[in-house]
């Protein structure tokens, strides 16, 4: 089993020193879901929500969150992201919204936390915008779909077991 990289021999939390690592292109994708009633989803789809364009607001919130991950997650490094993408898809057959985020950079550390933060904050924004019409929406699951670049190698969710 791998060791926890943020914990030293004394069990204390520390930011990982990446100064000796090579710069490589790194990319990560994450997804989150927001389950809701059909009527709530219909308001989002047809644009009749009184707060405005829910998807546009959630997309911008997710992008902003990815850029500020280092301020939210204590041991994350500040990163110069070269790409952040947040896509939202209404899935009326499941009464939910699927959010997929992508983050990319050329750097010394991965962007998994940025992708996860983008997807989660986009989901939270949907909840915030729609809570006046439905308070029992469910956020989740949230997960990393894939990562590439870096010493630990590539990772991709085995979608055959979804």
Swiss-Prot record:
Binding-site residues for substrate, renumbered to this chain: 75-77, 113-114
UniProt-listed GO biological process terms: Mo-molybdopterin cofactor biosynthetic process
Record Pfam families: MoaC
GO molecular function: cyclic pyranopterin monophosphate synthase activity
InterPro entries: MoaC (IPR023045), MoaC_bact/euk (IPR047594), MoaC_sf (IPR036522), MoCo_biosynth_MoaA/MoaC (IPR050105), Mopterin_CF_biosynth-C_dom (IPR002820)
Disulfide-bond pairs as recorded: none
Keywords: Lyase, Molybdenum cofactor biosynthesis
EC number of the protein: 4.6.1.17
Active site positions: 128
Domain of life: Bacteria
Catalytic activity: (8S)-3',8-cyclo-7,8-dihydroguanosine 5'-triphosphate = cyclic pyranopterin phosphate + diphosphate
Entry function: Catalyzes the conversion of (8S)-3',8-cyclo-7,8-dihydroguanosine 5'-triphosphate to cyclic pyranopterin monophosphate (cPMP).
Similarity field: Belongs to the MoaC family.
Name of the protein described by the UniProt record: Cyclic pyranopterin monophosphate synthase
């Amino acid at each position: 089993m791998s060791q926890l990289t943020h914990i030293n021999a004394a069990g204390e939390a520390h930011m990982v020193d990446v100064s000796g690592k090579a710069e490589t292109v790194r990319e990560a994708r994450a997804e989150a879901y927001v389950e809701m009633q059909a009527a709530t989803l219909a308001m989002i789809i047809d644009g009749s929500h009184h707060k405005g364009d829910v998807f546009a607001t959630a997309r911008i919130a997710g992008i902003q969150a990815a850029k500020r991950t280092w301020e939210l997650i204590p041991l994350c490094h500040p990163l110069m992201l070269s790409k952040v993408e947040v896509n939202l898809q209404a899935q009326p057959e499941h009464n939910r919204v699927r959010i997929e985020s992508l983050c990319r950079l050329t750097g010394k550390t991965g962007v998994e936390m940025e992708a996860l933060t983008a997807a989660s904050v986009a989901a939270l924004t949907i909840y915030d915008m729609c809570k006046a019409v439905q308070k029992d929406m469910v956020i989740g699951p949230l997960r990393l779909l894939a990562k590439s670049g870096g010493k630990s190698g590539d990772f991709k969710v085995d979608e055959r077991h979804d």
